[in-house]
Amino acid sequence: MSQEISYTPDVAELLDFDKKHIWHPYTSLSSPLNVYPVKSAHGCKLVLDTDSPVDVEVIDAMSSWWCVIHGYNNPELNEALTKQMLKFSHVLLGGFTHKGAVNLVQKLLKVIDEPSLQYCFLADSGSVAVEVALKMALQSNMSGEATKNRTKFLTIKNGYHGDTFGAMSVCDPENSMHHIYNDRLSENIFAQAPSIVDGLPTSQNGFEDHWNAEEVTDLKKQFELHSDKICAVILEPILQGAGGLRPYHPQFLIEVQKLCNQYDVLFIMDEIATGFGRTGEIFAFKHCQKYQDQHGISPSDQIKVVPDILCVGKGLTSGYMTMSAVVVNDKVASRISSPNSPTGGCFMHGPTFMGNALACSVAEKSMDILLRGEWRKQVSAIENQIYRELYQYIKNPDNGLIGTVVKRVSVIGAVGIVELYKKTDPEWFQKKFISKGVHIRPFNCLCYIMPPYVITTEELTKVNQVLIEVLHEWKSHINQ
């Protein structure tokens, strides 16, 4: 059932000011997309600020750009933030420290659970984390005679790593939203991206194990051609995010690790979108060990896939505050900290809000929730439900979507992806979704869902049903 949205004069006035003066993400000021005012939120629902005498709620299937993993107005996170707010909101991390920062890093390292990753830099946002990671890799290589001339980054096409300059330089150079800046960015090295899979062979839903060794041919070629220039490899493990929402086979990541080992190249993993359970493992790179375990490879013969530099963000604070972190191994930390390094051992980066006490308090509690382990059952249930209700429906040709308007459908952990043949009309789609009580924000040819882990079975059923309904309406719309 659709609902009409209307506003009180006061709210309409605010929306008018917003339209004239506020720049929204990836939007034109001269012809901005419609926006919907939110007055409160709880669980998985946003409450719109309308003139209705009863609350108009929409289920947020996007987790506010993938970060609100524990849901809105979470009592535990609220309490942690409130307690800290009454003590102090922020203190310079240069020359000072505080219990919140120390406790957060202790628990973050427990969540990561990799003995080699022991050194943490707290940053502001996902893009800043990537900038820090690139800078760390460069400075680490400056400290070695054999590596000091390695200044290029190797990545794969269809990647997305953020909107700042260094991050843009490792985004897809042809099809990304940043391609217009190409001739103004540092020039890096791009290999062909791996093929998309419908789902992972590590999934409980029994996706077929399609691996083709040819997938790494171009990557190997780039290593052979440029090994003396490659400072580090950077990529999004297992699921490429805003560059196309492309899940790929764990074996590809294993092969990348082999090449990094062979050529002694640092490996940066950008888990800003995929980290903290989103793909079904606490971090996406851990699918590699699971895949090798499934194939009966003994631990002594397995390829240990683990980054030298790990970027995390989004779910770190579950959307309460902006925060990210970069975690590195001893190899990177000791090179940067060497008295013989160009800076005398200092890493020359220091955000104003580094280790913000409010952000640390809520991030620490977010880590507590993850350490309890409930996320695994939640994400597993979400994946199963998306598979049954959305994936299987769309894959059935009798339902008239696959091969007509839908090019492919994938499910990986708490992510459902529908790629269309035609580019979406965001205004048309958002109006349809909101009127039916669901928030899904499409981009390019993609409609996808990444709900909070706390979404109920009933809420997710509604999300899946509304998405299917709107896809059928889109089919009729474009065929008019």
Curated annotation (Swiss-Prot):
Residues the entry annotates as binding pyridoxal 5'-phosphate: G126, S127, D270, P351, T352
SUPFAM superfamilies xrefs: PLP-dependent transferases (SSF53383)
Keywords: Aminotransferase, Biotin biosynthesis, Pyridoxal phosphate, S-adenosyl-L-methionine, Transferase
Modified residues (N6-(pyridoxal phosphate)lysine): K314
EC number(s) recorded for this UniProt protein: 2.6.1.62
Any single GO BP term: biotin biosynthetic process
Effect of K229E: In strain: ATCC 28383 and ATCC 204626
Disulphide-bonded residues: none
Protein family per UniProt: Belongs to the class-III pyridoxal-phosphate-dependent aminotransferase family. BioA subfamily.
Protein name, UniProt field: Adenosylmethionine-8-amino-7-oxononanoate aminotransferase
Species, as recorded: Saccharomyces cerevisiae (strain ATCC 204508 / S288c)
